[in-house]
């Protein structure tokens, strides 16, 4: 019966949505249709079609009142059950607080005591929470570069080798990067699940603070580069791990560290193939690739792309003027 009754709902809803004047306008359209397309008003006496309309609307009105009454009853019953359950829980917890002590307190006072006890227990858990990294994190900590094959790489000795994500794996957290953003992962080795309100996380344009309330922050310092705070986000994953995404403002530089107090990684050892360089548009990608090439050439003491361009022009000029002697010329 319900399915049969609502079979025209979609059609009528579509028509009703086009009536910005609401129900009066919608009813006016229905009456207009009956006037123009049927003999509803002229095929019978006015008293007859008025009675028909009243019968239909009275029937639907009674159904609406009955349905609304049933909904109110169901809601009140649900609220009573909920209230009874809460009273039972409060009573049980009051008894648990002090089995040997009779307390003459109100429900509100009992609720306040329970909340205070829960807050204390939660804070005790947080205060006793260890900051030890997981074993897997310790095993994968980034190692310093102790040996180089090229003389030009001597300046990289002592710096940390980038991890597979072009970032760094430290004792308490891991970060990776592309030219566009930094991904930070902070696992908490706890025996209980964290909640978002247990955390203190602040992302500034040039600063980052991450930690558990009541404890020394795990990270609290100046970022290596500036970030867009409105595009940077964090999420608590599986109640154990904080994941933070920082959106770089300068998308043409690799970060050598997350915060200035961190050990430095060797940006010369970064593998751009593992970054999202392919996601950049053609013009930006060409510019970044040229910049990275010139940076490597300068570090190796070799000519940059601009230097090569000048050398090519000079060679062509020499070929066009063989009569000229360039052997005693010095070029910068």
UniProtKB/Swiss-Prot annotation:
Chief place where the protein resides: cytoplasm
Assembly, per entry: Interacts with PCID2.
Function field: Chaperone protein with functions in nuclear localization and cytoplasmic mRNA trafficking. In postmitotic neurons, acts with nudE downstream of dar1 to ensure correct positioning of the nuclei in primary dendrites and as a consequence, is required for determining multipolar neuron morphology. Stabilizes PCID2 in the cytoplasm and thereby is required for promoting cytoplasmic mRNA trafficking.
Listed CDD domains: p23_mNUDC_like
Keywords for this protein: Chaperone, Cytoplasm, mRNA transport, Phosphoprotein, Transport
Molecular function (Gene Ontology), one example: unfolded protein binding
Domain CS: from-to ranges: 168-259
Protein name from the UniProt record: Nuclear migration protein nudC
Source superkingdom: Eukaryota
Subcellular location: Cytoplasm
Disruption-associated phenotype: RNAi-mediated knockdown results in multipolar Class I dendritic arborizing neurons forming a bipolar morphology. Dendritic arborization is unaffected.
Listed GO biological process terms: mRNA transport; nuclear migration; nucleus localization; positive regulation of dendrite morphogenesis; protein folding
Family note: Belongs to the nudC family.
GO cellular component, one term: cytoplasm
Ranges for region Disordered: 122-161
Pfam family, one: Nudc_N
């Amino acid at each position: 019966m319900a399915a049969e009754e609502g079979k025209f709902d979609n059609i009528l809803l579509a028509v009703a949505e086009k009536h910005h004047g609401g129900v009066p306008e919608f009813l006016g359209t229905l009456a207009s249709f009956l006037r123009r397309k049927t003999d509803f008003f002229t095929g019978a006496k006015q008293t007859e079609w008025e009675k028909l309309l009243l019968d239909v609307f009275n029937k639907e009105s009674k159904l609406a009142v009955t349905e609304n009454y049933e909904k109110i009853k169901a809601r009140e019953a649900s609220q009573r059950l909920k209230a009874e359950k809460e009273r039972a829980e409060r009573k049980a917890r009051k008894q648990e607080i002090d089995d040997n002590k009779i307390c003459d307190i109100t429900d509100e006072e009992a609720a306040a005591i329970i909340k205070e006890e829960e807050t204390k227990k939660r804070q005790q858990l947080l205060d006793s929470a260890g900051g030890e990294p997981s074993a897997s994190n310790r095993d994968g900590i980034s190692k310093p570069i102790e040996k180089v094959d090229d003389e030009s790489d001597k300046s990289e000795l002592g710096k940390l080798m980038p991890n597979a994500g072009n970032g760094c794996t430290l004792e308490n957290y891991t970060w990776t990067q592309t030219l566009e953003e930094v991904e930070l992962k902070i696992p908490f080795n706890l025996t209980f699940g964290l909640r978002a309100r247990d955390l203190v996380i602040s992302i500034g344009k040039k600063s980052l603070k991450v930690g558990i309330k009541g404890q020394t922050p795990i990270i609290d310092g100046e970022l290596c580069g500036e970030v867009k705070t409105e595009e940077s986000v964090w999420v608590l994953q599986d109640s154990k791990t904080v994941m933070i995404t920082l959106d770089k403002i300068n998308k043409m530089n690799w970060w050598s560290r997350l915060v200035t107090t961190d050990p430095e990684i060797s940006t010369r050892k970064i593998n751009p193939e593992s970054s999202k360089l392919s996601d950049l548009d053609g013009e930006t990608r060409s510019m970044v690739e040229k910049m990275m090439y010139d940076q490597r050439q300068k570090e190796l003491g070799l000519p940059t792309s601009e230097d090569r361009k000048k050398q090519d022009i000079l060679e062509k000029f020499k070929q066009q003027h063989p009569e000229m002697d360039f052997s005693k010329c010095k070029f910068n």
